[in-house]
Amino acid sequence: MGYRKLGRTSSQRKALLRDLATDLIVFERIETTEARAKEIRKVVEKLITSGKKGDLHARRQAAAFIRHEVVEVVQVDAKGKDGSTVKKNRPVYALQKLFDDVAPRYAERQGGYTRILKKGPRRGDGAPMVIIELV
């Protein structure tokens, strides 16, 4: 089974797919070209399937691919030096969101975690644009 070259060298293509896959996990919906969306779909489906396994090996494989990007910052209660409770800001990363939020959502689903909606041609060059989102 082949893949699309997307007019780039292999390192550029890998970086593009990493960025778009991370963005799809973070935002759960992105707008891109049709060819890119079809390639991202393959990558994200495999990441979510490994996220459903949830073991250490799956987490390390996903960490090797997903960018170390902060999704949001949450406040948590922590103990201070004097024993009082203090509010601390703790970042939530894309990998953590994949394993804690996204993958458990699809525990009963056997594949088909993404949806591609056609949007129409891009104004500048007429490239077919789509919206890819997590179902």
Swiss-Prot record:
<dbReference type="InterPro" id="IPR047859">
    <property type="entry name" value="Ribosomal_bL17_CS"/>
</dbReference>
<dbReference type="GO" id="GO:0006412">
    <property type="term" value="P:translation"/>
</dbReference>
<keyword id="KW-0689">Ribosomal protein</keyword>
<dbReference type="GO" id="GO:0022625">
    <property type="term" value="C:cytosolic large ribosomal subunit"/>
</dbReference>
<dbReference type="GO" id="GO:0003735">
    <property type="term" value="F:structural constituent of ribosome"/>
</dbReference>
<dbReference type="Pfam" id="PF01196">
    <property type="entry name" value="Ribosomal_L17"/>
</dbReference>
<keyword id="KW-0687">Ribonucleoprotein</keyword>
<protein>
    <recommendedName>
        <fullName>Large ribosomal subunit protein bL17</fullName>
    </recommendedName>
</protein>
<comment type="subunit">
    <text>Part of the 50S ribosomal subunit. Contacts protein L32.</text>
</comment>
<dbReference type="InterPro" id="IPR000456">
    <property type="entry name" value="Ribosomal_bL17"/>
</dbReference>
<dbReference type="InterPro" id="IPR036373">
    <property type="entry name" value="Ribosomal_bL17_sf"/>
</dbReference>
<comment type="similarity">
    <text>Belongs to the bacterial ribosomal protein bL17 family.</text>
</comment>
